[in-house]
Amino acid sequence: MDFQPGELCAYYRLCRYLGIFCIDYNPTKKKFRLRRSVLCYIVHFALQAYLVGCISVMVTYWRRCFKSELTTTGNHFDRLVMVIALGILVVQNAWLIWLQAPHLRIVRQIEFYRRNHLANVRLLLPKRLLWLIIATNVVYMANFIKTCIFEWLTDASRLFVITSLGFPLRYLVTSFTMGTYFCMVHIVRLVLDWNQSQINAIIDESADLKMTSPNRLRLRVCLEMHDRLMLLCNDEISLVYGFIAWLSWMFASLDVTGVIYLTMVIQTKKSIVLKLITNVVWLSPTFMTCAASFMSNRVTIQANKTAKMLTKVPRTGTGLDRMIEKFLLKNLRQKPILTAYGFFALDKSTLFKLFTAIFTYMVILVQFKEMENSTKSINKF
């Protein structure tokens, strides 16, 4: 297959430099391939070794560098969030490097649809999103260094400071991974939209009996493309990125809870506006995860439009009717198109699950805090 590089090449290249996966565009053969370079694997295993080392240090010296402003519950929860963040990144990196072959098939199919059906469309979202990811990473890292290194860990050992730097790495790697997923889903949605425009044109011409035979062939091609796109989303994209999305949502619930809890417990002289800006920076990984779910939801809406469109087609008494009825019967009970590895659908309902998890964690933390305060009061007497 003769591919041309698209807007997502920058994402693939950056992910290769970060040791996430080895997919790259070969200009000589004009197609995407697995460029299994030694440097990519060195970066990958060096990052994995560093993260495992960070986890080991944090678990071994669990009570080291607890903040006096926090309760014991808050300190333990804060340390738990950091360890889980590092553990999730280790699993995420291993998952993506292991599934490079199916990932390459996804990339080739996405680029194939992009070249054949969206050649005249200028995609602005991937480039804008890339600059947004880079900017938020810089701000996030600067905020982490300012808050954690120069404020909370001023008295900590150098080893512990180096260990804590693994936390912002999770956002760096995950942001480019989810950014790639976001752009892939965006292209799938645009291809679905293009396919629906073709189906609309066929429906408009279906009244002309002379066009019945050619229209039947064209409609079959369009419906088969729809099925292939659904298969791409349901099986391959959900396989590679679904597990990553599930890990991201699981961490997002803990991360948001931690930020809210710290804001409630730690009293500072900062203005409300400054606190709000700081919290927005801390929660930028969660916003990226939520944005990916909204894009997935748009794909589901776009795909369901095809079935709704075909239900309104008047019957012609030809082979077109049987083809449409077969398609509608197969799509009558549409399963979730993009899922978090089968755990839940990636759509707007996921936000409700996130808020439910955050509320549950907050209730548990507050209860532990009250129990801790009660124990301290009893011990005073």
Swiss-Prot record:
It is a multi-pass membrane protein. GO terms for cellular component: axon; dendrite; membrane; neuronal cell body; plasma membrane. Residues 1-37, 101-129, 193-239, 293-350 are cytoplasmic. Keywords: Cell membrane, Glycoprotein, Membrane, Receptor, Transducer, Transmembrane, Transmembrane helix. Residues 59-79, 151-171, 261-271, 372-381 are extracellular. One of its GO terms (molecular function) is ligand-gated monoatomic ion channel activity. This is Gustatory and pheromone receptor 39a, isoform C. The lineage of its organism: Eukaryota, Metazoa, Ecdysozoa, Arthropoda, Hexapoda.
